[in-house]
Amino acid sequence: MRALALIFCMALVAGCGKSQRMCAVCDRGECKGMAFRVTLENGKVVETCCPRCALHYLETNHQQARKMEATDFATGNWVDATRAVYVSDSDVHPCATLETRQDPQGCCMMKTYDRCLPSLVAFAAKDEATVFQKGHGGQIVGFQEIPRK
């Protein structure tokens, strides 16, 4: 009986890592309410932790997207990324590590670069984005207006 319980626990733990979706760009786990999915012209689906990583993927790999879907931060549902409303550079950044390090002289702390910053949070409705922005700052933009780099 004890051996059976041990095998069950090992199988449970082994399955946990496989269910976690990993970002195709930064290798982080999927961020709650931030995931982004790109279907390329060749049919390949690329999943990223956030919209910022998806844009980075498309720009650096010179790929054309047939379809793009963002997670609506308010509901967790998939929405057409080109029709979503985004809040850029808010104080909410679930994907970023926000590490700080000392400068070469060892005295001052500085933020390290993080590909997921500035944050980019997607919403299906502008009113939800406005409520979010009032509480967390940032700029409301459409897909075509997203600041690139």
Regions found by a protein language model. Give the residues of each.
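Positively charged n-region of N-terminal signal peptides that target proteins for export
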Residues: M1-L4
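C-terminal motif of bacterial Sec signal peptides marking the signal peptidase cleavage site
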Residues: V13-G15
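Bacterial signal peptide processing site
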Residues: G17-S19
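Short cysteine-rich clusters marking metal-coordination/redox-active sites
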Residues: C23-C26
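Short functional micro-motifs and their immediate structural scaffolds
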Residues: C31-K32
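Beta-edge loop/turn motif
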Residues: K44-A54
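Short metal-binding segments enriched for Cys and/or His
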Residues: R52-M68
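Beta-strand-rich cores of mature extracytoplasmic or soluble domains
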Residues: N77-R148
